[in-house]
Amino acid sequence: GHYSRATEINPENVKNLKKVWTHRSGDYHQGANWTEDVTPNSSQQTSFQATPLLVNETLYYCTPYNRVFALDSETGEEKWIFDPEVEIEQKALLHCRGVGSWIDDNKSEEDKCYHRIITGTIDAELFSIDGKTGELCKDFGNNGSVDLRAGLGDHNPAFYYSVSPPAIIGDLIIIGGGIADNISTSVPGGVVRAYDIRSGELVWYWDPIPPGQEPILDDSGRQLYQRGTTNVWSIISTDPELNLIYLPTGNTAADNYGGHRNGSDYYSSSVVAL
């Protein structure tokens, strides 16, 4: 549930609420119960997990196919639709938990990308969208998107994704990623990255390497994101007043069995504050 300060709706009268409108995206897949066979090669199923975001008079939400809808909050009428045209090959469960929202105080309401909607995808891209028009903000990354696979090394594309809403603090986007569970310990690492919300440039990253372990370097001496580390697939929280970011970590690969982790699960199942 979600806390609300609304006083006109209370435990006594909530039963009297009437449905005003319904919106259907059409983005779903029919088939067997997805919980029976969740592997990268199983039949693709959809799960609607998004919490709509209300900004002024517009509702924003994402679908299991990672399309983003902007709706009139009073009528449910579609204002625009953004389609990232995700690659769903070998993805077992298609879903999206929400989008991020940011207002650029350096711009006026008439300027392009004064209001930005930020969203990650199941094929590991990060998009910046104009909240008014649904068009990409071309000054962000590569014509509006950032490749989240950068620095992860060779891996099966089905094993890495980012479908929880990006967290935003100041002018930074904070984003983690999820991996395919119960497959292998040789999967992309759980790095959490911060990107400049205007340019899409990488500002910093947190690689959850356990204390005492040395980072892995490439031939040029740059640190690589260590494979198989604890990831942050869920929803990140921020506290602008304290300038803190709270990361809810999951289990280190391969999820429910820890016998092959070799100490890489130091940050597993924890809350980490950065």
Q: Where are the regions that the model predicts?
A:
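Short, solvent-exposed loop/turn and secondary-structure capping segments
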Residues: 2-4, 32-35, 64, 71-74, ...
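Beta-propeller blade signature
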Residues: 129-134, 188-202, 261-274
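Repeat-blade elements of multi-bladed beta-propeller folds
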Residues: 44-67, 92-125, 158-184, 191, ...
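Inter-blade boundary loops/turns of WD-repeat beta-propellers
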Residues: 11-14, 73, 131, 197, ...
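Aromatic (tryptophan-biased) beta-strands that constitute blades/sheets of beta-rich domains
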Residues: 1-43, 47, 77-86, 135-155, ...
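Generic hydrophobic/packing signal
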Residues: 56, 63, 72-75, 82, ...
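Active-site cavity-forming subdomains of large catalytic enzyme subunits
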Residues: 164, 190-191, 196, 212, ...
